Amino acid sequence: MAWRIEFDEASKKDLSKLDSQIARRITAFLRDRLAVSNDPRSLGEALKGSELGEFWKYRVGDYRIIACIEDGALRVLVVRIGNRKEVYRS
């Protein structure tokens, strides 16, 4: 089962600000591991909190990918990408 990976505007901006080597590593993770996974939840961890329950985080080195998984559409919507120290602040 192939999942479709999509980016919202904020995550596109986040990705463009990253060093090119880190950006390639993140896109490779999304393409080679997450998109082809039978269950994208098995690779990540649910964010805690009442407002954050629908979001999942994925760890790629010191960087985190915050995404929303839509089972009905087989889609993973990436909403934020950033360093683990800063990605949760906004």
Residue spans of the language-model regions?
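Enriched for short, Lys/Arg-rich terminal
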Residues: 2-4, 9, 13-17, 24, ...
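Secondary-structure boundary motif
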Residues: 17-20, 36
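A short, surface-exposed loop/turn module that caps and links secondary-structure elements
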Residues: 32-57
